[in-house]
Amino acid sequence: MRPRWLAALTVLTTVAAGIAGCQPQPSPQTASSQQESQSTAARQSTPLDAMQDAKRAGDLQLAWSLSKPVLLAYPEDPKIITEVAQLAFENGLKHESADLLVEAVRANDHADFAYVQRAVIGLIAVGRMFDAIDLLNAALTRHPQQHPSRRMLFGFLRGAGNNNAAVSHARRLILDRQIEFEFLLALGDAGEHKLETDSMQQMVARFPADQRPLMAVAKTLVDQTEYAAAESMLQSIVKQHPEYLPAQMLLGRVLVERGSWAALETWSQELSGDYESDWSYWLVLGDWAYERAEVAMAVRAYAESIQRNPDVLQGWTKLNVALNELSAIDAASYEGLGWDNSVQDWIEDRVRRLATLEQLREQFNPQRPDAVIQIVEIASTLRELGRLWEAEAWAAIGMTLPNGSKDRLAETRASILRLLRKDTPWQSLAKQPVLNLGLSNLPAPSFLKHVDRDAAHSHVAKVQNDEAFAVSATPKLSDVAGNVGLTFFGRTRDDLDKPGIPLYATLGCGGGTLDYDLDGWPDLMLMAAGGTPPQLDSQPNALFRNIGGRFIDMTQTSDAVDTGFGQGVAVGDINEDGFPDVLLLNYGVNRVLANQGDGTFRDISDELFTDRKSQWSTSGAIADLDLDGLADMMVVNYCDGFDAVTQLCEQPQTGLSRSCAPTHFPAAADVVYKSNPQGKLVDVTSKWQSTPSMLGRGLGIVVGALDAADGTDVLVANDMTYNHFYDFTATDPPQFSESASLRGLAGDARGNPQGSMGIAVADFDQDQKVDLYVTNFEQEYNTYYQQRSNHTWIDTTAKRNLTQQSLPLVGFGSQAIDFDNDGQQELIVTNGHIDFPPPDTKLDYYQPLQIFRLRSANQFESVALPEQDSYGASLHAGRALWTLDFDRDGQRDVVITHQTEPVALLKNETGTRHHWIAVQLRGTRDSRDAIGSVIQIRHGDQQQTAALTAGDGYLCSNERASWFGLADGSLPIELQVSWPDGSQQTHSLDQYDCHWLIVQAQSATRLPKSRSGEGD
């Protein structure tokens, strides 16, 4: 739905340009005609008559020369001033004409909107947009009820990127009962909307003396993460207009995103005006303080920001994370706040409701048949946020819609009206204690001059000095699937190469690695679909046995057949017998295949689950979540029910039936299963309080020791809803509570939920803390979460140079992998759209494989793959991606599934002589798989950390081992294992280029190439 203000701005700019381009030019006058005109003028009794006669005679120059006495004679007559303005315009004096039209408005005391509108058009015609804004402000000062002027001013301010000012006028229009959807949708989005850049560029082309309209272009560049270009443009704006706070505030934000801290400090010293009243100033100040590890100061700054604008989601999310970190690292300061113990619960509730509101507003369309239901949800959410006038306005305009029953909406409106009084403020403080936080016990934030940023104040780890940084070798990958017997094409439909793919068929099919026969060679389980969920009519999945680097289909022989609508695979020892079992995730009924140890599997689903349901499951993990020594299970679910199988949604722009957005269907809750001593899996989701306040639409999962605390954590990547992070607390009853917003993992840097799918896990910056990389949908950069403290993360994607490359792509599976074993992890991402985009877009269904490597200690670069790499040089509709070392040469390989082509096995042929070790763990006191362990190694002056995980991202399971590239290597290798139960053990390894088995409380064992030791 295109906002009316945007359309009006475009039309107004075009109309003004047309007027300017079609102005009549003064005609050359002959001497006789000039004499005749002058003679006629001399006979007139007034200057006005003389001017008008000259104009009628076609002598525009003479008429203009006679206009000054007219203006002196009629200084308060708006009609005559307008006539002179028209004369100036016809003489090509466009700026003079605009000035006179403004004078006519003043002469009319701004009372008649027709004069105001005419003057605005004149000013726009010469590019003086901000003079038009000043004029409209003046008109509203004199006549606050001049609603057409306020509407026009709202549009100009919104178009120029000054959302703070635009929102104030939208609120006034709503309070004056001038309720329109575009005003309601403008509220509370902190400027996160599409801007009309062409019109703004036309303004500057017409009037280069005012660069402020380019704010719209700069804002668009920021939205596209083109921070360098945005900074350059904003610098030119503030150089010309240092007092223009919207540009200054956006510049501050850009400097934060770029990590230009010295420039930010200079920026702060050059600010003038009432900048401290702007919420975004305090947000920038909070980011600066947080980067410097001044956490208490950051909390104060973020709190100051939300007090100035409590509707900005990112202010609340950042306050939430900073407050959580303060409680962990500075208990005295946290307790000294004097805040209620439940303050973080209040903040999380505010975050949840604001996030819900943003999603509801984004999905809203008054043309939808369920628009009234949408409005009920929006109005109810606003009521809970204390924004009662806004809530009532939504309900009121909803009552005017032609379709849908209004009974529930009428009840909702009545409940809101009962709370409203004439003196009710826009943001009610009733039942909103979080809006009254006392800040006096927090340090007053202020920018200080800190040019020397020592290590104590920097959370950007240095692997080594940039000057000495050795860039990893360019990976060489070859698809050898067909050469080694891996021929399989698991797909969701047969027509995935044609437009109109329904949502249920867009996710693809995944797979996983397991050594089911314990011969040391990793085997593969691959999923398939193609039928109709939840029926058992799909193509069967496949189990490929790896014999010395070649694969043989053992599906039928091993009794591993399932014909459900396959999605993902989870691998783990669910019954603790030493053999890896398999969880098959389906859109329908999930299945657990128990490894019998004799080369066959048995479906134990009915005897294992106490309650088994049909659901849309995507990914899962098998791991001991409560540290009782028994493997548990977590199942990630997507949308609830089966409507997605039959429903398509018509696209308003094209009228074509396409895949519905996931948010068109209800979200499904993830399920946590606990193993009991009787060998059953019991659903403990409710008992462990594991249902989050806002359900997600889960696609990816990783389970492991993701933070520094003992125990196992879970990250779930959700599509178009906030990600979830769970950690177990051994209370009575136990709690497996969700805390992604507290940890900084719920959304991106601005607090927005994204279309999250794949997850890569590694200590990329080698600070001995786990970092995370989450893939997202197009125009949502893949997010790099750097672990900042022992239990919080921060989005540093822009600082890592990882935003631009992923914006135009749809990222699915991703993994961290050290291709050349130099000790530094790279990133690999498979991309592909969910459907064929409309023909008038620049998007592609088939998209490139991407690999990123560190080009310096802190920044990544995209790797251009060699032309001889036929797979990397071509485009694909990739889906799941996971790792293994299928030929056991010490270089990890990659498996990728696709929508329109068979599975690919990318053999890692990167030329290197670097050394390596692979470490496998076996628990004795802990669960046998030992998920949640952390391995640290030291060799020479190098130190590396790896968390042993399950789930492994999008629809997949990696080979269960931890790889360490050693570069040139040095012996001995000091290895320390931190087990899930908190115990530690150390070993000194005397060989590399081999697999090591570490059994809990036993000596390390070097494994021969023929066996992995999984059954030992």
What are the functions of these language-model segments?
Residues 508-518, 566-580, 594, 616-627, ...:
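Beta-propeller blade termini
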Residues 48-49, 79-83, 113-118, 148-155, ...:
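Alpha-solenoid helical repeat scaffolds
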Residues 75, 109-110, 144, 175-178, ...:
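Short coil turns that delineate tetratricopeptide repeat
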Residues 373-374, 486-510, 537, 558-570, ...:
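Repeat-based blade/solenoid architectures
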Residues 376-378, 394, 689, 801-804, ...:
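Gly/Ser/Thr/Pro-enriched helix-cap/hinge segments flanking short amphipathic alpha-helices
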Residues 477, 521-528, 577-586, 633-637, ...:
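Hydrophobic beta-strand segments that make up the repeating blades of beta-propeller
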